């Protein structure tokens, strides 16, 4: 297992009601996808940009 196992966690909005567009790595599609983050809670599969998500979670060949 890699140190980036959190990339395979589901996207979690969290319990707050904010509206923060974020990105998560989807293990189903193998791509970084947009979701809405509530502002608190959640997990580490939560990135401010698709680029940050990709550089962290895309499998290295």
Curated annotation (Swiss-Prot):
It holds the Pfam family Kunitz_BPTI. The lineage of its organism: Eukaryota, Metazoa, Cnidaria, Anthozoa, Hexacorallia. It comes from the Eukaryota. It comes from Anthopleura aff. xanthogrammica (Sea anemone). SUPFAM superfamilies: BPTI-like (SSF57362). Protease inhibitor. GO terms for molecular function: serine-type endopeptidase inhibitor activity. Its main location: secreted. This is PI-actitoxin-Axm2b. GO terms for cellular component: extracellular space; nematocyst. It is found in: Secreted; Nematocyst. The record marks 17-18 as: Reactive bond for trypsin. The keyword Secreted applies.
């Amino acid at each position: 297992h890699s140190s980036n196992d959190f990339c395979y966690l589901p996207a979690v909005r969290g319990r707050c009601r904010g509206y923060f567009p974020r990105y998560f790595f989807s293990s189903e599609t193998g791509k970084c996808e947009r979701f809405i983050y509530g502002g608190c809670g959640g997990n580490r599969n939560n990135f401010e940009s698709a680029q940050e998500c990709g550089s962290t979670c895309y499998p290295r060949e």
